[in-house]
Amino acid sequence: MAAAGAFRLRRAASALLLRSPRLPARELSAPARLYHKKVVDHYENPRNVGSLDKTSKNVGTGLVGAPACGDVMKLQIQVDEKGKIVDARFKTFGCGSAIASSSLATEWVKGKTVEEALTIKNTDIAKELCLPPVKLHCSMLAEDAIKAALADYKLKQEPKKGEAEKK
């Protein structure tokens, strides 16, 4: 209940800072100016929030964190039998830039093959979201989460010791 209240308070504060008719754009506070409209959009309307069944063989899970700022990101991918990512979900505890980076990453991996998803770089995420230099670590978390999820998926595809000996 307290988390929901805090979320509503943050959303209301950001709405006031970003859309108040009494505050022209040039007079926005410093924190509001740090976030590009793309970050605000992904923060206020995050895409693909949630979880997939981590025990499923076709789901890869990546869990990464940044000790410097306390951000934690879980990103999951679901891959079909042809090696194409058909779904992606995330849960992130962190700032607006971390949430936006996670949201964008899930959008970008969907429809890609496992190998294509490996080419997504933090610099591309940072550029798309117009992240300031002090928030680049958030895009790095997203790249690391993608790589960790892909590695987990690939590990699940390897035959188990007992299965390999039976064949």
Swiss-Prot record:
Record's GO cellular component terms: cytoplasm; cytosol; iron-sulfur cluster assembly complex; mitochondrial [2Fe-2S] assembly complex; mitochondrial matrix; mitochondrion; nucleus
Record annotation: effect of changing M140L: Does not affect the SDA complex formation. Abolishes desulfurase activity of SDA complex when zinc ion is bound. Activated by FXN when component of SDAU complex
Transit peptide segment: 1-34
One Pfam short name: NifU_N
Molecular function via GO: 2 iron, 2 sulfur cluster binding; ferrous iron binding; iron ion binding; iron-sulfur cluster chaperone activity; molecular adaptor activity; protein homodimerization activity; zinc ion binding
Alphabetized UniProt keyword annotations: Cytoplasm, Iron, Metal-binding, Mitochondrion, Nucleus, Phosphoprotein, Transit peptide
Tissue note: Detected in heart, liver, skeletal muscle, brain, pancreas, kidney, lung and placenta.
Modified residues (Cysteine persulfide): C69, C138
Phenotype upon changing D71V: Stabilizes the S-state
Effect on the protein upon substituting C138A: Does not affect ISC complex formation. Does not affect the unstimulated cysteine desulfurase activity in the absence of FXN. Loss of iron-based stimulation of the cysteine desulfurase activity in the presence of FXN
PTMs per UniProt: Phosphorylation at Ser-14 is required for ISCU protein stabilization in the cytosol, whereas dephosphorylation of Ser-14, due to the inhibition of mTORC1 (mammalian target of rapamycin complex 1) complex, leads to degradation of the precursor form and ultimately to a decrease in the mitochondrial mature form.
Keyword presence, Nucleus: yes
Residues annotated as the enzyme's active site: C69, C138
Disulfide pattern: none
Mutagenesis / variant outcome for changing N122A: Stabilizes the S-state
Protein origin, superkingdom: Eukaryota
Similarity-based family: Belongs to the NifU family.
Protein name: Iron-sulfur cluster assembly enzyme ISCU
